[in-house]
């Protein structure tokens, strides 16, 4: 028997016609869920990009180091723009050549490398019904000459979403991860990540053995065991859905015991890293990538459908491509 189509009622928050909303919009604590957005691009210096964003969204620019700027009080809240390379940020590194020769050299290098080393625009927590407003920033960057991952053979630029977890319980976290691993081959077919990003391994899939463990409907660990299992299989940030920031937020001591030197920012969010950033493509919008994430959350919220999907995966004899077809039918038919 085929599963009934997913029927998610419209959100009372409204949202935007091109942008779907997840089925769970309020956390276990009763607050509206938010999402952070990060987009990488080249072709503009950090200072130039900050000016572009200020012109489009308002706010006041504050320089935090030669290649990092905050735009305070924009229509999207406080934003950050910086060159995505620690060596060009004297304030972030105690001992490097830039710190020795001064901020003027750091600023010059930031401008000189703007076509090679990407900039990154980062939002703070944004209400999920306002995600569509981020496209205004994308449009402004494109008009100013920003380049996307498709514009250079060595570019590997990503669009990242940091959706707030609906809660701190295993019931708020495991279903989302389970839905994600079961839909991963479908997502990759839809997203078609840039070959350079795949080659450089910025957003690798989860190991096959770990996928089978998480896919099993009988896998129901408590939170501590879940964190231990995750760390044993994934002692790295290099995953297309990075849970280390979330797990660090939930139990920092447990994570640091395994990864004492890993650079991990603690926050109550998933870190979805698979999509490309194609800022320069005419009409490129973050809507399709956001909607694919919402599709994962919708499957996660349907316990019966999720269990059927997991059981089917464990008994599936085919390859990844044919599983993507089967997963799409089971999840969305």
Give names to the regions the model predicted.
Residues 160-162, 271:
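Structured core elements
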Residues 2-119, 125-139, 168, 172-178, ...:
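C-terminal accessory/tail domains of diverse enzymes
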């Amino acid at each position: 028997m085929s599963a009934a189509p997913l029927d998610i009622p419209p959100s009372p928050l409204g949202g935007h016609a091109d942008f779907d909303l997840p089925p769970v919009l309020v956390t276990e604590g009763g607050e509206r869920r938010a999402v952070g957005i990060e987009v990488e691009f080249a072709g503009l210096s950090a200072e130039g990009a900050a000016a572009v964003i200020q012109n489009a969204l308002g706010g006041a620019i504050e320089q935090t180091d030669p290649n990092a700027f905050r735009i305070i009080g924009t229509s999207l809240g406080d934003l950050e723009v910086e060159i995505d390379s620690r060596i060009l940020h004297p304030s972030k590194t105690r001992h490097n050549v830039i710190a020795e020769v001064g901020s003027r050299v750091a600023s010059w290098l930031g401008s000189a490398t703007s076509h090679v080393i990407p900039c990154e625009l980062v939002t703070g927590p944004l209400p999920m019904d306002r995600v569509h407003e981020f496209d205004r920033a994308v449009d402004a960057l494109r008009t100013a000459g920003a380049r996307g991952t498709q514009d250079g053979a060595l570019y590997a630029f990503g669009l990242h979403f940091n959706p707030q977890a609906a809660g701190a319980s295993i019931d708020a976290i495991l279903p989302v991860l389970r839905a994600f691993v079961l839909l991963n081959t479908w997502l990759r077919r839809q997203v078609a990540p840039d070959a350079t990003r795949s080659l450089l391994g910025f957003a690798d899939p989860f190991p096959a053995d770990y996928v089978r463990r998480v896919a099993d409907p009988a896998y129901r660990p408590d939170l501590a065991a879940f964190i231990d299992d995750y760390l044993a299989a994934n002692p790295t940030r290099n995953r297309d859905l990075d849970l280390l920031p979330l797990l660090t937020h939930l139990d920092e001591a447990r994570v640091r015991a395994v990864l004492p030197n890993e650079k991990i920012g603690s926050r109550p969010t998933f870190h979805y890293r698979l999509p490309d950033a194609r800022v320069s493509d005419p009409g490129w919008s973050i809507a399709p990538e956001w909607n694919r994430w919402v599709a994962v959350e919708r499957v996660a919220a349907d316990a019966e459908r999720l269990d059927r999907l997991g059981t089917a995966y464990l008994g599936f004899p085919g390859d990844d491509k044919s599983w993507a077809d089967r997963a799409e039918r089971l999840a969305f038919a």
